Each structure stands twice: as C-alpha cells, then as structure tokens.
C-alpha cells in the first residue's frame, strides 16, 4: 500500500476542508511482481488519511492504524478494525497519540501491542501500549530511539542477525569514554 495525493475534484470541498489535495491510501496486488492489478483505494474514511500500518490480531481480525491528515495542525493517529486486511473497517477509535504524530508501527510483546510513532514537530518518538486497540497507555518514558530517527518498521530477525548488526555497529561506531 502507499499514500498519494489525488485530484481534489474527485472529492467535495468539505471533504478536504479547504486543502487543495486529498490524500488516500492505495494498493495493488500481484502474483509474480511482474504484472500488477490496477490500483484501488485501500482505505477511504472520507477525509485525508495516510501512513497506514496493518496488524493481524487473529484469523479474520485486522487492525489498521492510520493518520488523520485533514488539515494543517490536525494530524492524529487512530485505529479501525475489520475482518480482512482489505476491510471493510469500523468507525475510528479516539486518537491515542499527541497531535503531529505520524508513521505508526506496532509490534506484539507478550499480551500487549506496542505502537510506536514519530511525534515529528517535537523531533521525538512516542509509544503507547494496548491490549484491545481501544484503550491506550503512554509508554514514552520506557522507550529509547536513536536521535534523528523517523518513520520505522519493526521486524523479527534471528538472534544471529542481531548479534552481527551489533558487532558491526561496535566496529563502525566505537564507544568513547
């Protein structure tokens, strides 16, 4: 999936709240990475929305974490759920991150989901913990993100890969006392 500006004439002026473009998430499908189906709107809540991240909680249970990008000064993160990655999705949750947050990424740790996000106007990362994607507990004071880091994704790798990366980091950036 990707987000893009589309011609505003496709939407009403009230939809974009005075902005001269509308942002939506799109997707395509492929079986061979040579030919692709025509692009389709992925999630369209009727207002500018970008930076989606999908979580599969269980069979037929997906959560989309996405940015409400309606107008300058209004960029909040919210969650919607649905029976498949393609939706249809429910009504949005309440916002759970500071205004001016974007680029969400989630990872399951134990019985909680940790959602990380870029609080871009403050030049920092924030995070919340949730079990149900309806109630959120801030955990900013429990995370450490490298200075200058922006949007990111968390992936699982074998421990050997992690150890090799840490060894390479130690060679390239030795600690100074």
Show which residues each predicted segment covers:
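Beta-rich carbohydrate-recognition and catalytic domains
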Residues: 1-103, 108-177
């Amino acid at each position: 999936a990707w987000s893009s500006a589309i011609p505003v004439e496709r939407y009403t002026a009230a939809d974009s709240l005075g902005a001269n473009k509308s942002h939506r998430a799109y997707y395509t499908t492929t079986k061979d990475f040579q030919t692709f189906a025509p692009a389709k709107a992925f999630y369209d809540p009727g207002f500018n929305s970008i930076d989606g991240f999908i979580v599969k909680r269980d069979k037929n249970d997906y959560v989309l974490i996405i940015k409400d990008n309606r107008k300058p000064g209004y960029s909040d993160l919210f969650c919607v759920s649905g029976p498949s990655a393609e939706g249809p999705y429910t009504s949005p949750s309440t916002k759970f991150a500071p205004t001016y947050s974007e680029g969400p990424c989630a990872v399951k740790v134990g019985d909680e989901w940790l959602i990380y996000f870029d609080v871009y106007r403050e030049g920092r990362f924030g995070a919340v913990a949730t079990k149900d994607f309806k109630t959120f507990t801030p955990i900013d004071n429990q995370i450490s993100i490298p200075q200058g880091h922006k949007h990111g994704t968390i992936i699982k790798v074998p421990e050997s890969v992690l150890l090799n990366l840490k060894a390479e980091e130690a060679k390239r950036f030795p600690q100074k006392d």
